[in-house]
Structures are given as C-alpha cells and as structure tokens.
Amino acid sequence: HFIKAEGEENVQPEFPFLCLLVSGGNSQIILVKAYNDMEILGQTIDDAAGEAIDKCSKVMGLGYPGGPIIDRLARQGNPKAFTFSKPHIPGLDYSFSGLKTSFLYSLRDWIKDDPDFIEHHKTDLAASLEATVVDILMDKLRKAAKQYKIKDVAVAGGVSANNGLRNSFREHAEKYGWNIFIPKF
C-alpha cells in the first residue's frame, strides 16, 4: 500500500524509492525499484519498533496498544530527559530488543528509589523512548538513502502514524532534500 501513498504535494514517489515499513511486526527498509521489484535492504533481527514500544508501554502500565499512548504522552515530554541504549548493528538491519531491555532495567532501578517514578515522569519517559526509536529508525534510513543515492522516501505501517517519526521525516526532507511520502491519517 505504500506505493500508492501520496506525499505532501499529492505526487507519488518515482522509482526507485525507499520505503520504511514500520509496525508492531515489521521494521524494514525496502528499495522499491518497480511495482513488482522490491528488495529488503534492512530489517529487524529481533523485535520490531512497534513491538518494542508496545512492550515498554505495557511495562509502564499504560496499556496496549502502546503506540498511540506513547505518542500522545511524548508530545508533552522532554525527549532528552532520559537516555536509552541504541544498538550498534552493522549494515542496515534493526534491533530493538536491547532498547526494550535497557528501558526495563532503567525503570526497575528508578522505581527502587521512587515507587511513583513512572507516574512522576511518564511524559518524559514516553518522549525519550519515542526519540530513541525514531533515531534508530532514521539513522539506518539515512544511511540507505545515501548509499543508494535515493531522494524519494516513503513510510508505511502502523508506526507511521507516530508524530515524532512524521516530524523526523519532515526534518530529514528539509535537511537532505528528500521528497517524502507520508500516509494521511
């Protein structure tokens, strides 16, 4: 469905283009060469981005699905309040299990000192988690765009509704001259 996604100016991407497919089940960078010719350049080797967000939301007691809840809370928080580990995976593959573990262990330690830590910091936790996920996603996508000399970049999947990711796409468009294609929600 990402091939039919319309960009900010109601145009479709020209082949070849990149698509970041990001959901609860997938995190992939796809090189779309034609309607029936696609190549997965990178994908998750463990948890998908959306799955990690959902699990972190559950650990915080926020419910499922966690994506919309984290997105809403993140808008009110400081994305630099907390730092979580980012994977150092070579190539264009993704890994989110380490982030999930880092988040869980950090919460466990903070709750020892303050049993109400999550309640006192949930907007900053959400914003910091979202910022980390977006940084991981965009770092690999940026590398793929540079490596394959691609300027048309699309995003698809449930996590494409996330405001932090959508804003990062817009920032990358301005900074790197990308033509972006973001689904309308």
What are these regions (language model features)?
Residues Q12, C19, Y64, A81:
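A cross-family phosphate/adenosyl-ligand binding-site feature
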Residues S23, V32-N78, K100-T101, Y105-W110:
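Glycine-rich phosphate-binding loop plus the immediately following alpha-helix
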Residues G24, F181-K184:
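Active-site catalytic microenvironments in core metabolic enzymes, especially phosphate/sugar-handling
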Residues H1-F17:
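Conserved phosphate-binding catalytic cores of ATP/NTP-utilizing and phosphoryl-transfer enzymes
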Residues S23-G25, V153-N162:
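Glycine-rich beta-strand-to-loop/alpha-helix junction loops that act as flexible
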Residues R72-V153, N163-I180:
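A contiguous, well-structured pocket-lining segment that forms one wall/lid of small-molecule binding clefts
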Residues C19, S27-L31:
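Short beta-strand scaffold segments in enzyme catalytic cores
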